[in-house]
Amino acid sequence: MAFAWWPCLILALLSSLAASGFPRSPFRLLGKRSLPEGVANGIEVYSTKINSKVTSRFAHNVVTMRAVNRADTAKEVSFDVELPKTAFITNFTLTIDGVTYPGNVKEKEVAKKQYEKAVSQGKTAGLVKASGRKLEKFTVSVNVAAGSKVTFELTYEELLKRHKGKYEMYLKVQPKQLVKHFEIEVDIFEPQGISMLDAEASFITNDLLGSALTKSFSGKKGHVSFKPSLDQQRSCPTCTDSLLNGDFTITYDVNRESPGNVQIVNGYFVHFFAPQGLPVVPKNVAFVIDISGSMAGRKLEQTKEALLRILEDMQEEDYLNFILFSGDVSTWKEHLVQATPENLQEARTFVKSMEDKGMTNINDGLLRGISMLNKAREEHRIPERSTSIVIMLTDGDANVGESRPEKIQENVRNAIGGKFPLYNLGFGNNLNYNFLENMALENHGFARRIYEDSDADLQLQGFYEEVANPLLTGVEMEYPENAILDLTQNTYQHFYDGSEIVVAGRLVDEDMNSFKADVKGHGATNDLTFTEEVDMKEMEKALQERDYIFGNYIERLWAYLTIEQLLEKRKNAHGEEKENLTARALDLSLKYHFVTPLTSMVVTKPEDNEDERAIADKPGEDAEATPVSPAMSYLTSYQPPQNPYYYVDGDPHFIIQIPEKDDALCFNIDEAPGTVLRLIQDAVTGLTVNGQITGDKRGSPDSKTRKTYFGKLGIANAQMDFQVEVTTEKITLWNRAVPSTFSWLDTVTVTQDGLSMMINRKNMVVSFGDGVTFVVVLHQVWKKHPVHRDFLGFYVVDSHRMSAQTHGLLGQFFQPFDFKVSDIRPGSDPTKPDATLVVKNHQLIVTRGSQKDYRKDASIGTKVVCWFVHNNGEGLIDGVHTDYIVPNLF
């Protein structure tokens, strides 16, 4: 029975030991001073290399160890590697005296009999088993003749998950003896560009940090190298044992100029999604805590310490309650309460007073917490735009009340009804972790084991930090209909800050011209739609550097993700559904050479006219390219209405187009940089638009030579408590004083009652209901241009719902007005005639000219002919232009 609880991945090398009868003892690689440098027990491990290539978060790792038997008799050599639990082994090869024995992945049941036969014959074997919190240990032993060399090579792959804002790759370094050539080489390629890269080790010294470890990144490429010399490996200047014993961790993140990134290679696509700058969605948390007798002592104290830290991180918009279970169930409050300073102080007192007692009634504890969240929603005790979660901590199995795991699972599933996630934390090893994991998975959460160490409280706090900041709920990833096959999971209950959603799939037609991905979700203040478009021809150009990366990495990433998700679904499936999931996961595991819980790695080594094999199983917890350039086409659904059309663009040129006259008027405003002008104000609808002037890089005080533009715009609706500040770098939306920040490179739609805001690269469209639509255009110039800088254009394409009281430099023209142009005559410039304009009881001299309408094309624009009114529009605008200067943007 003990074996059944031992989660192990087995690799057995089925080869007999030397006929000389040399005793089979495990190889320990412990050095002695009397032996030659780098030799232990007659074996010299002269090379250990870890080579990793990471392409778009997908890591391909090769661990190679080379050894020679310096003794005059046969010796046994062991190869130990610790690899992440989330990784899949893809190959293992053994080379003895130049002859290579390759690995082959087979269905586990096919290989099982061969393995059992080998064990019964007493042949050498190795294990891969759980090793610590994040790793599994792979071990294989082989008998090596005197003077012979052996090479072990293990390959594994994994998708690096984003965790608290960065990707992490763990490598265990433990050579156990001095190694002549020891090195770790990691090459990272990210088409989005690398924003940070770091590497550190638990055993690092100043000497190693200064010369043995190098790390660098530039653009899309990053590199980490660790090559300690023999002397640098010594634990002391005269020692022969190695100080290289611990964790080697690489962390990095990528540039996120837009929330999503789509990559397509050979008919497969991957979509990475991680928006930034969004406000946190308020959360309602039911903490369901086990206080049974087994939690007594250090475990309960650590739980209290963690909960006290978590209370420090609660936001005032959050709601919470504590549900304690032992033989019975008790609660801190009858209902969820808001995390006000007063309530949090009372909660701290309650947490400190928790005492252990009695049995373990998991069923009733969970159902009480779930019921509390459901009632809070039904009785409108919590904000409408908030999200609920259940966090349960237990250290044992249910032993009172309903104790059947399958029945508890059913009760919890029915009570939650798919409305919110359940996160289960298993404290220690004396519990049914599979039960906790399965229950969490089928309720859109996950399970974590909390290890009984001195840092258990930090483990608990670390988990909470992962789910503390939901930015979106109800996330749906949508792709072209009938254009994709074999899509991985594309709906998620939450997107948490610092994480990333990854979706992959296969294209029906590889010859598509473009590919579009939409992501919809509910934010803290409004609903959002993010759009990512990829031009396939541009994508093809972007892959010209693909020799830098390994193989069809997107196809393998898709296979990895698909297998991982099929295996998760399989845990809670039954009957025919489970058989189908198993068959699909097995087929993919065999096709892509992954060692999963359904397959085994077999290494064939002919010996004594027999096929000798090595078998590896996968345990569970309980047992170079250029950036993608999406198409920048403007949302053409916004066409100019037949109504008058108004805009300001350029230096700054105000243009009033009057369709009835088949003509247009225009004027400039010359003011100093920093001046804020009132463009639109409507007291009835509550709409206001202001613009701040920015100057060119020369900073000339002479208005005749100075170029000025609008560098910042403020759009506000007082009735909706809505504000949006638009600059050339970003767009910040305040909805009821809660900010959301977007980049101009985002493709996103924000919707709520009476409001729609769409950002599509160089354009932003804001609509207030049916009848008010503004467009903001971003003009970008070469960053190193000696004079010009980026600026904004503002266009009113629909204003028929604005009131008759609307005013401002543009707003005053929203109501019908008449003008007459006469006496057209040659001007000072032969190409620009003058004329007489009669408007608003003024007779003005105007000049024929032309401006550009950039609403559809920010680069080229469309020519617009207009009559230019001189002197800051004097006579055309009401009053003088200085009447429209306001103190600030809002």
UniProtKB/Swiss-Prot annotation:
One of its GO terms (cellular component) is extracellular exosome. Residues 21-34, 652-890 form a propeptide. Residues 1-20 form the signal peptide. Heavy chains are linked to bikunin via chondroitin 4-sulfate esterified to the alpha-carboxyl of the C-terminal aspartate after propeptide cleavage. Glycans are attached at N91, N580. Residues 284-467 form the VWFA domain. Belongs to the ITIH family. I-alpha-I plasma protease inhibitors are assembled from one or two heavy chains (HC) and one light chain, bikunin. Pre-alpha-inhibitor (P-alpha-I) is composed of ITIH3/HC3 and bikunin. This is Inter-alpha-trypsin inhibitor heavy chain H3. The gene is ITIH3.
